[in-house]
């Protein structure tokens, strides 16, 4: 168990390709309005930032964090030779490798650096079904939780002696035996890790006490569960959740608004919870999506694009705009898309080196230019 308060990273994947232009809205730009006759947002719609850019109207809670200087907006984020396939683009973001197929994820490699001896099977926790590739790495255990309230291998076994006896039983059942092959031994190790992780995480729910009332939707529930684990102080450093789908080929005005309303409100509740528990400076949140959308609408939505926007939020974040806002001029477009102007791995490198205190080069494969959105000291 880890008693001291440590820095942690929460990664929220905006699955499907978030429309950057209707998130950070260039509402005074004529090209924006001309290109999006059906889905543009006007000056009276947006939450103004600086007289030319505005947040989507449903991002009110994020705007409050922005006003406290706790939101970094990473404009024009992407990678060389953009790929408009959901699967390939997400794979690139997950593995931090844009030129070849990498075997493991950037966060999986990060977990390996944090805990090379696998002493803590809950160093990283995914909230949701399955395991995102970003968290995958050989011999690295990661717990995956659907609902913390019902999570646990033995939720109905309450007595200490009973639980210890049950854990010993499962340990013998999953433990390695002489003469078994490597695959069975690996499965056994994963079984023991899952068993221990389930038992540790199940305790976080009972310890939680807060006056914050979260909404009842998947992203709010996930962030509430993340808060529970943070406050339990069990040594978890990496948290992962997903929100979507942002694949708004049709019905974008309604769907995009609903998604950002849910996420913005959930983040507002999450940071109020952190502040109530004195942890607002210990947690940094990354929001990312695999790509942006095309500059022109298609009638009621937008198709897959390239350059996008990411966000870094937290009490230790130096808020503001980072990366150049992509031009909408025809000569600056990439086949009808906004041009990317900063590599997403620069954001990863900043979070690794400046926030988690981990050398980013072994994880990302080389040096990347870094931002200054993490406060010093």
Question: Which role does the model predict for each range below?
Answer:
Residues 1-277, 296, 309, 313-377:
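Feature for exported/extracytoplasmic and membrane-associated proteins, marking the mature portion
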Residues 267, 271-299, 304:
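Metal-dependent active-site segment of extracytoplasmic phospho-/sulfohydrolases and closely related
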């Amino acid at each position: 168990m880890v008693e001291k308060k440590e820095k942690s990273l929460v990664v929220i994947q905006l699955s499907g390709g978030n429309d950057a232009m209707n998130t950070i809205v260039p509402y005074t730009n004529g090209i924006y309005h001309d290109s999006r006759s059906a889905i543009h947002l006007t000056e009276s719609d947006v939450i103004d930032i600086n007289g030319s850019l505005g947040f989507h109207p449903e991002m009110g809670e994020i705007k409050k964090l922005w006003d406290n200087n706790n939101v970094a907006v990473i404009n024009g984020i992407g990678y060389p030779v953009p790929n408009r396939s959901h699967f390939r683009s997400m794979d690139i973001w997950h593995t931090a490798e844009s030129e070849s197929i990498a075997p493991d994820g950037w966060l999986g490699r990060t977990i390996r650096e944090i805990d090379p001896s696998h002493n803590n099977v809950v160093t990283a926790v995914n909230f949701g079904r399955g395991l995102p590739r970003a968290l995958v790495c050989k011999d690295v255990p990661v717990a995956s939780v659907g609902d913390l309230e019902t999570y646990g291998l033995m939720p109905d076994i309450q007595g200490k002696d009973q639980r210890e006896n049950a854990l010993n039983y499962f340990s013998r059942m999953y433990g390695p035996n002489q003469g078994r092959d490597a695959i069975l031994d690996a499965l056994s190790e994963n079984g023991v890790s899952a068993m221990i992780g389930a038992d540790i995480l199940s305790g976080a729910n009972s310890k939680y006490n807060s006056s914050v009332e979260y909404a009842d939707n998947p992203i709010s529930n996930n962030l509430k569960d993340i808060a529970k684990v943070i406050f339990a102080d069990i040594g978890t450093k990496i948290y992962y959740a997903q929100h979507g789908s942002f694949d708004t080929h049709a019905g974008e005005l309604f769907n995009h608004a609903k998604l950002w309303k849910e996420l913005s409100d959930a983040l507002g509740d999450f940071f109020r919870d952190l502040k109530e528990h004195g942890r607002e400076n210990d947690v940094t949140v990354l929001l990312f999506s695999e790509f942006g959308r095309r500059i022109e609408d298609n009638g009621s939505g937008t198709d897959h694009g390239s350059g996008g926007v990411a966000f870094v939020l937290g009490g230790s974040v130096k808020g503001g705009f980072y990366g150049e806002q992509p031009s909408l001029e025809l000569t600056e477009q990439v086949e009808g898309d906004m041009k990317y102007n900063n590599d997403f791995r620069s954001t990863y490198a900043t979070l690794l080196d400046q926030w988690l205190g981990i050398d980013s080069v072994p994880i990302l494969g080389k040096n990347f230019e870094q931002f200054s959105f993490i406060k010093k000291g």
